[in-house]
Amino acid sequence: MLIDPQCIYSVRALQQLQSYVESGRLQVSVIPVSVLDPEDGGQSTRSALALLSRPAGELVSAWQAGNVTGTPSPDAPDRLRANLAIAEAIHLQGTPTFIWRKPDGTEGRLDGIPTSVEELVASVGS
C-alpha cells in the first residue's frame, strides 16, 4: 500500500482494512511516499521522512497515531527516494495505491479507496 502520510484517503483506506489485518486475513505493507507537497507546503516529505526514520514495526502505528514529526534519520532520505522510484516505476496516480500478487500469479492493482473491501481481500487470496 503506497501512501502519502498526509493523505486522508490513505488513512481511510487503512482504517477500512484494519479488521482484516488484525484477524490475519490480510497482510499490508505500508510504503510512504510524498506526493502532496505542492498542496501542503512540503509537509508530506517531512512526514514521510519521519515515518521512514522509525523502526519498520512502528511505522504504521506512528502513522495511525499522527506521530509524523521528528528529525529524519540519516538513511531516511535514501529510503524515501527508493519509495519514490517505486512510485514512478508503477506510474503512481495518487494515494493510496495497492499492488499485490493474485492467487493466479497476475498483478492486482487498486488506485484509491477500495469500494468493496471484501472484493479486495478475496482478490488478494491467501
Regions found by a protein language model. Name each.
Residues 70-79, 83:
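Alpha-helical scaffold elements lining the catalytic groove of polysaccharide deacetylases
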Residues 1-73, 88, 93:
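Structural alpha/beta surface segment adjacent to cysteine/selenocysteine redox centers
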Residues 27-28, 78, 125-126:
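Short, charged/polar low-complexity linear motifs in solvent-exposed/disordered segments
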Residues 99-126:
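Non-catalytic, surface beta->alpha helical segment in thiol-disulfide oxidoreductase systems
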Residues 83-99:
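C-terminal structured interaction module
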